[in-house]
Amino acid sequence: MRGEVRVQARKPQRQSVRRARGSLTEDAIVETAFAIAAESSIEELSIPLVAKSLGVGVTSIYWHVRNRSELLDAMTDRALRRSGLPAFTESDDWRESLKAHARGVRRTFLSDPVLTDLILIRGALSPLARRLGEQETQKAIANMIDCGLDEQTAHDTYSAVSELVRGSILLARLVQKHNAVQRTESADEGGFTSAPVPPDDRAFELLLTSVLASVAP
């Protein structure tokens, strides 16, 4: 209408959280990536998602890590240092030493889903992870040979136990992911959610004992 003064309402502008110049570090990036992975999964982790969580531009992240693969390598190294993965302990009873090591490794991975995703599911090892793995393998095989096994039998036995441990962890992780999806869907539909099912140790122990008992001496 004539004489009316139209006042256009201004939309409130979204306030972006910006970090102070120079405050972004690789440590902050890696820790944020861990938080994202713990809430979702390694598969969903991306550089843009990390940048968004930190309130910075994607380009700022690339000043510290060149790509997603390098970020995952940095996470893997940090996860390994934090995990307390048990070292192989030599003894005169190689079966007990290998059994204790297998149980310890399995227990560590089962308690840390992000570590499992980074090392076992991702399939690409950082130089540190590869080096640590090779050291433990050589130590275990050397102990088995010292106890009377020939080199080929020692290698085959260690490989069999490693595959058993790896398979048990991966199966438990897949079940965990499947149950998480089911709980989410059930919650969205307003239904009841069941408690997570703990991994079955009995099958693992039976197979581990059988593998070790089949080896002479």
Feature-to-residue mapping (PLM):
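Hydrophobic alpha-helical connector segments
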Residues: 85-121, 125-126, 132-135
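Helix-turn-helix
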Residues: 28, 32-70, 74
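Amphipathic alpha-helical packing segments from all-alpha helical-bundle domains
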Residues: 123-160
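Alpha-helical DNA-contacting segments of helix-turn-helix folds
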Residues: 37, 72-79, 129-133
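DNA major-groove recognition helix of helix-turn-helix
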Residues: 65, 76, 158, 165
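Amphipathic alpha-helical interaction segments
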Residues: 28, 70, 100, 156-163, ...
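C-terminal peripheral helix-coil segments that are non-catalytic and often amphipathic
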Residues: 1-13, 146, 174-217
